[in-house]
């Protein structure tokens, strides 16, 4: 096992032969990525971290197994939050242009924030789309920012204002709600 691959936790009951009954949760980070495998009762069986862009046979083996459920949280750099009433997918090329990106190198994905009636648009490089596409449907990828905003919006019921600071891999994300409305992310 390489020093770029870390097994954080492994349960004695974990076996790859039962993978079709398991859930695979992946955090696709900027420098490091992490996967966790849970059983039918949501008990953690395996927690594994690896440095991105390093070919690790064990990671490839685990990614290629069939799972009951797969969820991928993508640590995106580019994000646009657009009210649902203004969003139309026919304008995707313009959204990419706003981010100074092109279709040749990036793919625009969207995630609906139902609680706030907002579309969260985020980009994934085509290189990462191709890598992840070997194992999963691109529709299984969700923006970390969208999940964070959606979760926080459910926590503000009785608060007039709410500030969240999320630290990750040397960066910080600030999310601010006032009067139950998203003000800043």
Regions inferred by a protein language model and the residue ranges of each:
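Hydrophobic/aromatic-enriched cytosolic interaction surfaces used to assemble or bind macromolecules
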Residues: 1-185
């Amino acid at each position: 096992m390489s020093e770029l691959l870390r097994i954080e936790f492994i349960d004695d009951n974990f076996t790859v032969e039962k993978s079709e009954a398991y859930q695979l949760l992946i955090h696709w980070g900027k420098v490091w990525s992490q996967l966790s495998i849970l059983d039918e009762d949501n008990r953690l069986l395996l927690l594994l971290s690896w440095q991105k862009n390093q070919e690790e046979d064990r990671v490839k083996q685990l990614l290629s197994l069939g799972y009951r459920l797969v969820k991928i949280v993508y640590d995106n750099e580019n994000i646009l939050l657009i009210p649902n009433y203004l969003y139309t997918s026919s304008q995707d090329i313009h959204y990419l242009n706003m981010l100074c990106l092109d279709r040749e190198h990036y793919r625009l994905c969207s995630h609906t924030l139902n609680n706030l009636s907002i579309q969260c648009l985020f980009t994934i490089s085509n290189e990462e789309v191709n890598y992840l596409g070997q194992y999963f449907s691109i529709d299984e990828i969700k923006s970390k920012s969208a999940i964070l905003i959606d979760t926080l919006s459910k926590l503000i019921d009785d608060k007039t204002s709410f500030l969240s600071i999320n630290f990750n891999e040397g960066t910080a994300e600030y999310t601010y709600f006032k009067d139950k409305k998203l003000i800043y992310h």
